[in-house]
Amino acid sequence: MSTSCVYPLETERAFQLAREAGFDGVEVMVTNAATTRDAVALRKLSKKYHLPILSIHAPVLLLTTFVWGRDPQVKLERSAELAAAVGADTVVVHPPFRWQKDYSENFLEIVRRIETTSGINIGVENMFPWKAKGRSVAAYAPGWDPSDWDCDNVTLDFSHASLAGQSGLELAQHFGDRLRHIHLCDGSGSQDDGQIFDEHLIPGMGTQPVAETLEYLAAKNWDGAVVAEINTRRAKSDAERLKALRKTVRFARTHLGLHTR
């Protein structure tokens, strides 16, 4: 479970809920909360709740502008260092924004260099085109879809695929052996359908072929990580939030062919 599932709750509460819901591990989204950047504190939480930290999500620019400074390359390097320090093997990163000129022009080289020096997999995440007044805006560079990029590891997010009008199953098939990581969620439609929000629905509540994708990966003995990244901010209580998280766990275990707890 990604700690972003219960944002803005404190990090320890995220670990508690992940444990109560029945998840096997945690992805830590680096935010303004100091605990998300403190390897010692994170290891203590991992030990306390018996949940390994599987991955680190590098800071997202729009939410964490000044976390670890303003240089996006430094942010990615620090994320890899944090991953190594807490025993995670993967860092999830979004493609650069076009206005991050030096970073975007050298992004794939930077990713490969950090992977080589740190031993951490950098899973570049699929995003979606931005639109303004019905027109596409080139917000990302090299782009929003890493399908054909020269990188060794990618992350598949179903909500992003939905907003982009793509099929998560087709993306998984196209990514092939480069698919390292999955953000388990769903979406109900694309921007062309009038959808404007990145929904991160409970899997099975949208229109993406999430079940089919998990079953496809299970059939080929895929060994990456499936990490829940659903939006529970509308939950009126922890009980309601926990219900959504447990539903997500059951969905994943069912379609991956794993025994439910």
Regions found by a protein language model. Give the residues of each.
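Active-site clefts of carbohydrate-active enzymes
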Residues: 189, 199-201, 223-237
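Acidic (Asp/Glu)-rich catalytic clusters
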Residues: 15-20, 35-55, 74-87, 108-118, ...
